[in-house]
Amino acid sequence: DKEHYFDPKKLSQHLTGYTGETCCTYNMLKLSRHLFCWTGDSSIADYYERALYNHILGQQDPETGMVTYFLPLLSGSHKLYSTKENSFWCCVGSGFENHAKYGEAIYYHNNQGIYVNLFIPSQVTWKEKGLTLLQETEFPKEETTRFTIRAEKPVRTTVYLRYPSWSKKAEVLVNGKKVAVKQKPGSYIAITRDWKDNDRISATYPMQIELEATPDNPNKVALLYGPLVLAGERGTEGMQAPAPFSNPAHYNDYYTYNFHVPADLRTSLKVDMKHP
């Protein structure tokens, strides 16, 4: 909040117009990649996915290509995007770098096998094994991702499919035959076999709507669908462009935190916690 870390157990007290600085998430993703290489912990991949889809993808204006400095979490608030000539923040520099990194962190490998961490259409070649993995999906618009193996000769190795913590009943098929999934959400589904050219894997991860409360206030919740944090479509009425750096006294100046998100709290989501 306001470019500073705070006690993570006091999240509900920091839902403002200055949350989610993009440079911070940029560096947290970089740190997460290193941590995963050291630990192989699937919870790190879960975090990476949530940050990637909810912050990095949400940072860019799909119409103009401009990007945000902050991602406001205040109910009823809206995002402010940079402009081509008057607004250039640190989050513009790292912001555009972010959007050149979608090919990172999808796959990892060690001596035991290859890890699939993200469900993004892509292709990876493991040269030492002579194996190529092609992934096809429209996730998160669909719950299924599909893989095709390319190999000049049979390769014995393990494919580790991330079993996200947000999915409860994963279904995996290899060449059309169901694989027994004994692992629990928040782990990896390990498939070890002699992989041949044109072998196919299909993994389906059902998504459902869930409520996630802040750690310090059970009455403040986020609404999620799978890894996606949902937000209402409110249109563009009342939105204003950010002020240029040369005018720090402007009403929406980021640099002195004088800007107040024009939040209409009447649009806040109200949930009956007894009957969610």
What do the predicted segments below correspond to?
Residues A45-N54, Q59-R150, K184, R193, ...:
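C-terminal beta-rich recognition modules with glycine/proline-rich loops and embedded aromatic residues
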Residues F36-D46, K153:
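Structural helix-adjacent loops and short alpha-helical linkers that scaffold large soluble proteins
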Residues D1-T25, T83-C91:
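Solvent-exposed loop and edge beta-strand segments that line ligand/cofactor-binding
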Residues P154-N175:
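Beta-strand-rich binding/interaction modules
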